[in-house]
Curated annotation (Swiss-Prot):
Required cofactor names: pyridoxal 5'-phosphate
GO terms (BP aspect): ectoine biosynthetic process
InterPro entries reported for this sequence: Aminotrans_3, Aminotrans_3_PPA_site, Dat, Ectoine_EctB, PyrdxlP-dep_Trfase, PyrdxlP-dep_Trfase_major, PyrdxlP-dep_Trfase_small
Protein name per its UniProtKB record: Diaminobutyrate--2-oxoglutarate transaminase
Cited Pfam families: Aminotran_3
Organism: Streptomyces avermitilis (strain ATCC 31267 / DSM 46492 / JCM 5070 / NBRC 14893 / NCIMB 12804 / NRRL 8165 / MA-4680)
Length: 423
């Protein structure tokens, strides 16, 4: 692909230096449809990024777009705080009937604000309020958001340093396989909890991602998650699952914890819950935890009604037919895994490991700078991928769940070429 030099001057002179994704993809995007984005010069890019997981159903999904346009054309409420609206009712009914009831999940639904970190902040606040304790346990390489409470339970040193103040009341513990399986799971954690001389304040809750997306595609085993849930129950701690990136079908089932057979006390959901890339987040919790006073936690943009419209349409379109969406995602995931096996076999001296679940995969190279070079070459070849991990050492694959097998094969062949050409 021949890419002419785009005019990026206004971004470079007016926008803050904090911008990041645009540095790796130096073009001006103009439109998008399905699994492709197009720049101003008409160049097409196959998207294996999906808005960092906020576009599980692709760009400008036609069913969701039609529902949104119809709603706006009839002057439906756009901004509603937490007022009762027809759009919110339609979403809550769809979510209850299509997601919660079939899974026997009795969760109450809270709208904490537009973004994932809003959901995490509300989850941490609620856990502390319920238990009357301050400490929260998180895990190595976790990522839960960029606001101060979320940063306190995030592992990445670079992101934590941006807080500018001490990040307190968060205690990190080793994630699954952090010690390469050499140390029994939870041995250290449980010993600290039971030892009155350990110096560990009893936590209110444990927050965990079943797959650490930003942390490097670290996949927790189902048995590890079950053991964690049992430990929380024994020690009177709430279990919070952060399903912001891995929920909404990303790993196959709607919730990423379903495979493990656990029922978290609190669940945070965002990114693809709106289905269309519109800001929306949820904090779900067991009814007995709903001890909020009216208005005790709020936010101006927690009632994003256009997002409720597309969210309801997404649930009705993709999740009304039992396990069809889950089966499709798992089949696409097997296609990705087979391609990564081939790439690994062709680069045995260079590849450290590949790992993933559903349609989230990563491939790690022994040379920590290799992932960045691969992502850059992939962009030049018309494929959008990002890196993850504490040192950006993992190539991360996050295509839309609606991607076709042909598009997936095209992108995987481009990835293999980028790997070869950066050796």
């Amino acid at each position: 692909m021949t890419i002419t030099q785009p005019d990026l001057s206004v971004f470079e002179t007016v926008e803050s230096e904090v911008r990041s994704y645009c540095r790796g993809w130096p073009t001006v995007f103009d439109r998008a449809q399905g699994s492709r984005m197009y720049d101003e010069d008409g160049h097409a890019y196959l998207d294996f990024f999906a808005g960092a997981g906020s576009l599980n159903y692709g760009h400008n999904n036609p069913v969701l777009k039609r529902a949104l346009i119809d709603y706006l054309e009839r002057d439906g409420v756009t901004h509603g705080l937490d007022m009762s609206t027809a759009a919110k009712r339609a979403f809550l009914e769809s979510f209850q009937n299509l997601i919660l009831r079939p899974r026997d999940l009795p969760y109450k639904v809270m709208f904490p604000g537009p973004t994932g970190t809003n959901a995490v902040e509300s989850a941490l606040k609620l856990a502390r309020k319920v238990k009357g304790r301050e400490a929260i346990v998180s895990f190595t390489n976790a990522f839960h958001g960029m606001s101060l409470g979320s940063l306190a339970v995030t592992g990445n040193a670079f992101k934590r340093a941006g807080a500018g103040i001490p990040l307190v009341h968060g205690t990190p513990m080793p994630f699954d396989n952090y010690f390469d399986g050499k140390v029994p799971d939870f041995l250290w954690f449980e010993r600290l909890l039971e030892d009155q001389g350990s110096g560990l304040n009893k936590p209110a809750a444990v927050i965990v991602e079943t797959v650490q997306g930003e942390g490097g595609i670290n996949v927790a085993r189902p048995e590890w998650l079950r053991a964690l849930a049992e430990l929380c129950k024994r020690q009177d701690m709430l279990l919070i699952v952060d399903d912001i990136q891995m929920g909404c079908g990303r790993t196959g089932a709607f919730f990423s914890f379903e495979e493990a057979g656990v029922t978290p006390d609190i669940v945070t959901v965002s990114k693809s819950i709106s289905g269309y890339g519109l800001p929306m987040s949820l904090c779900l919790f067991k009814p007995e935890l709903d001890i909020w006073e009216p208005g005790e936690h709020n936010g101006t943009f927690r009632g994003n009604n256009p997002a409720f419209v597309t969210a309801a349409a997404a649930l009705q379109t993709y999740w009304a037919d039992g396990s069809a969406m889950e089966k499709q995602t798992l089949a696409r995931g097997e296609q990705v895994e087979q391609a990564l096996i081939s790439i690994t076999e062709e680069n045995l001296a260079d590849v450290k490991e590949y790992r993933g679940r559903g349609l989230v995969w990563g491939i790690e190279f022994k040379d920590k700078d290799r992932a960045g070079r691969i992502a850059q070459r992939a962009f030049e070849l018309g494929l959008l991928i990002e890196t993850s991990g504490p040192e950006s050492e993992v190539v991360k694959l996050l295509p839309a769940l609606t991607i076709t097998p042909e598009e997936l094969d095209e992108g995987l062949r481009t990835l293999a070429r980028a790997v070869r050409e950066t050796a």
